[in-house]
Amino acid sequence: LYKNGKIEIYENINFTPEQRANDLLKKMTIEEKVGQMFHPPISINGGTISEIMNLASGRGDTTESLILNKNITHYNLYGSPNPSQLAKKLNQLQKIAERSRLGIPLTISSDPIHEVPRGGGVAAFSLKGFSKWPSQLGFAATRQPEIIKEFAEIAREEYLSVGLRTALHPMSDLATEPRWSRNFGTFGSNADLSSDFTIAYMDGFQGKKINSNSVLTMVKHFPGGGPQEDGLDPHLYSGQNQVYPGNNFEYHLKPFKNAINNNLKVIMPYY
């Protein structure tokens, strides 16, 4: 990957992940480190691999250009034709990443893709070819964490089969504001139940110990986005104020504290 005719520490599987990461960091330029801080969306719906456009870019950069010229290695999947084509395209993208100076592999993430189609917008997608399940609120209605873990284990296998390594879920927000449009994507308003369901979700996707078969869960939206002011969502300009009526901040924080104590590696703050 480093293209110097020898195997560097970060390329050598005989070293620990910590040793490999530290060696890689020492070799990275400031620009390459900055590139790790971005997480733009990409669509795999069509076109050649160099024509797949970045949805967030007003300049029309191809994903190939973002990888090789702007050092961006994290991408959020927005749409896919089918699992087979998705796997092929993501493998092609990884081949492009190998051509970068350090050959840092890409980390591809996705919002939920397994829900029964309902037009989830920014909250969830329903991609063809993947198994179909209820929303988080539907799972919560079962009151059975073991069912949630079973779903997460199956979804993990499907994610891995196409090259997705980070799940931009679950939502551990508490649905205490009935006007908020994303309540269906939560585990409900009970902090204790939401905590239990979040742990089961995490255990199914990533396991108690992170390994090569794990899919990381990015629990969201820290520190608790359920009680949006007037029910307005902060994805939009009109929903910029986060409030906690009744001094209930600690109550909304509870599922996130439990997730962190359960070996959470990545977390998504609200906007």
Regions found by a protein language model. Give the residues of each.
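Glycoside hydrolase catalytic-domain context in secreted enzymes
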Residues: 1-271
